Design a protein with these regions (language model features):
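Alpha-helical transmembrane segments of integral membrane proteins, especially early/N-terminal helices
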Residues: 44-48, 116-130, 165-169, 201-202
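Hydrophobic alpha-helical segments characteristic of transmembrane helices
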Residues: 1-10, 85-102, 152-191
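Juxtamembrane/interface alpha-helical elements of multi-pass membrane proteins
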Residues: 52-140, 145
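N-terminal transmembrane hairpin
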Residues: 1-81, 88
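Alpha-helical transmembrane anchor segments
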Residues: 1, 20, 29-49, 53-58, ...
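Membrane-anchoring/interfacial helices and their immediately flanking loops
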Residues: 1, 129-169, 173, 205-236, ...
Length: 251
């Protein structure tokens, strides 16, 4: 992936891409690879092969990091939106007012800019206020938000609010159930994210130990044996380093 495409993809996730910082991090990784490889007595032609592989993988790793951050931010936004609109509707009983209350939650005062969800809610409010619709005006308004943030629980919340808005009736108990369901969903999702991070940490520690074992093995071999200079030794050591990098990347 060339830098322009990488920058474009990162910007789509709502983050600023700095080519200078990205290259600085890549240079630090190269220095780390060279240091480890020299300690393991890997020859330069094999070190260059490792560096080439890392160079190919690096843009995908960067993009994966930003996409994960983007998905986590989207999850935080949609759960905050669900909570706010449910509480507002429970208190005021009107979808339009509940949307207006929810929109204020997503304005970044420090950066003085609107978030993506703030903009989507604004367009939904505008659609309701115009009063022009091909079908159910609330369904069409909520569809604007669901286009980017849609998920089963959000659909359920929106469908219920439309039902109460159009048919009336007592909604406090049902909204409490939806709020509880949202809370449990958040707890399960954050538990999964913590577990994923723990697995990544364990993989990193395991890779570190594997490098330590190889290094100790190299130290224990007398230099006059010349084993580390053998072609098969260089290939195996290089293969182990590459496999560990791939395992970390896929983990």
């Amino acid at each position: 992936m060339n830098p322009k495409n990488l920058k474009k993809e990162v910007n789509r996730c709502g983050y600023n891409f700095s080519l200078k910082k990205t290259l600085q991090y890549l240079l630090m990784i190269f220095l780390g690879i060279i240091l480890f490889s020299v300690l393991l007595k890997v020859k330069w032609q094999y070190i260059l092969a490792i560096i080439a592989m890392v160079t190919v993988l690096y843009p995908s790793v960067i993009l994966m990091i930003f996409r994960n951050m983007y998905e986590e931010k989207k999850f935080e936004d949609v759960t905050a939106y669900m909570e706010q609109i449910l509480y507002s509707f429970k208190r005021r009983g009107k979808i339009l007012i509940a949307l207006e209350d929810a929109r204020t939650l997503f304005f970044d005062e420090e950066k003085e800019k609107q978030g993506d969800l703030h903009e989507a809610i604004g367009r939904a409010i505008e659609h309701i206020q115009t009063g022009v619709a091909k079908g159910n005006i609330y369904q069409e308004a909520f569809a604007i938000i669901e286009e980017e943030y849609g998920c089963k629980r959000l659909y359920k919340v929106h469908d219920y609010l439309i039902q109460v808005e159009t048919s009336g009736g007592e909604c406090n108990e049902a909204i409490d159930i939806l709020l509880t369901d949202r809370k449990l969903w958040m707890e399960r999702t954050y538990a999964l994210l913590r577990e994923k991070k723990n697995i990544k940490t364990k993989i990193t520690i395991g890779i570190g130990f594997s490098f330590l074992i190889i290094y100790l093995a190299v130290l224990m071999i007398p230099a006059d044996f010349g084993i580390t200079d053998l072609f098969i030794s260089q290939i195996v050591t290089t293969g182990v380093i590459m496999c560990n990098i791939l395992i970390w990347f896929l983990g």
